[in-house]
């Protein structure tokens, strides 16, 4: 059993059963299938999802801040600040990802050379 414990109070927040090897393998396989599908999603759609994530973090900021405080023991003001930074980071990558991931032509001996960024898939 795994327990999530509030470090400030010692109160058990939740108890989790460990996964069997079969269940873990199934989850990794599902993640691999999802990664292949996700790799087909264009960068503008992904950027829009990051923007939606920023909005979600902001709309649920207090709930998530309370959860961080309970599970990690971080002061509430710091948890709120951390979530605000996460929302800003989502917006930053939403705005800049198309440029970061664009193919780049490079000078090389070959007739045509370029850098192309491709998803790695599931990383454990």
Tell what function each PLM region has:
Residues 1-114:
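N-terminal Rossmann-like NAD(P)+-binding subdomain of aldehyde/semialdehyde dehydrogenases
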Residues 87, 120-121:
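Structural motif
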């Amino acid at each position: 059993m795994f327990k999530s414990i509030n470090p400030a109070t010692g109160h058990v927040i939740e108890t989790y059963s460990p996964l069997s090897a079969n269940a873990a393998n199934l989850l990794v396989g599902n993640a691999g299938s999802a990664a292949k599908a996700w790799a087909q999603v264009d960068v503008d759609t992904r950027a829009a999802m990051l923007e939606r994530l920023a909005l979600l973090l902001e709309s649920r900021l207090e709930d998530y801040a309370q959860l961080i405080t309970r599970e990690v023991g971080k002061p509430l003001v710091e948890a709120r600040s951390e979530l605000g930074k996460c929302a800003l980071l989502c917006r930053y990558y939403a705005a800049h990802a198309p440029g970061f991931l664009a193919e780049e032509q490079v000078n090389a001996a070959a007739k045509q050379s370029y850098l192309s960024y491709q998803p790695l898939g599931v990383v454990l």
